[in-house]
């Protein structure tokens, strides 16, 4: 009834070892290809690009402090950025103002008892409006 005994079969281990060796060889080949392609790019002239030269010159020169000071001069002042947006007309709803009572939805009929008098309905609508902070 048991699952039986497991036996070590030497043939399976050889297959796994072969797969591992093949994977290692593939990884080594890929690494060699990457290294040779990088060196070929440098020979072709990618290493002599303006960006590469600028980066090398930046490392050699100590002018980085002056470039950092000039960096902030290229951006507009934050005051101007926010005041320009305030002057624009915004056509959306203003949430600081309460909605008009005519816009408010009416409660479903099954929420309201059928035996309500008009005075009770007015009282309920008043309570609903005060809950919604609407001026009556």
Swiss-Prot record:
Residues 13-22 have a biased composition (Polar residues). The keyword Magnesium does not apply. Its main location: nucleus. It is found in: Nucleus; Cytoplasm, P-body. Residues 58-72 have a biased composition (Low complexity). It holds the Pfam family PNRC. A motif (SH3-binding) lies at residues 96-102. One of its GO terms (biological process) is nuclear-transcribed mRNA catabolic process, nonsense-mediated decay. Keywords: Activator, Cytoplasm, Nonsense-mediated mRNA decay, Nucleus, Transcription, Transcription regulation. Residues 1-22, 58-78 are annotated as: Disordered. The keyword Cytoplasm applies. One of its GO terms (cellular component) is nucleus. Involved in nonsense-mediated mRNA decay (NMD) by acting as a bridge between the mRNA decapping complex and the NMD machinery. May act by targeting the NMD machinery to the P-body and recruiting the decapping machinery to aberrant mRNAs. Required for upf1/rent1 localization to the P-body. Also acts as a nuclear receptor coactivator. Belongs to the PNRC family. PNRC2 subfamily. This is Proline-rich nuclear receptor coactivator 2. It comes from Xenopus tropicalis. The gene is pnrc2.
């Amino acid at each position: 009834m048991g699952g039986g005994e497991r036996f070590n079969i030497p043939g399976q281990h050889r297959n796994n070892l072969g797969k591992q060796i093949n994977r290692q060889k593939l990884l080594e080949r890929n690494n060699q290809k990457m290294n040779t392609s990088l060196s070929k790019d440098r020979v072709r002239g990618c290493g002599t690009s303006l960006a590469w030269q600028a980066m090398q010159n930046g490392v050699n020169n100590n002018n980085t402090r002056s470039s950092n000071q000039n960096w902030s001069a290229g951006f507009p002042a934050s005051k101007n950025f926010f005041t320009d947006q305030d002057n624009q007309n915004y056509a959306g709803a203003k949430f600081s103002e309460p909605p008009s009572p005519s816009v408010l939805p009416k409660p479903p009929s099954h929420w309201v008892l059928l035996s309500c008098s008009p005075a009770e309905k007015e009282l309920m609508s008043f309570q609903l409006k005060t809950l919604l902070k609407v001026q009556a």
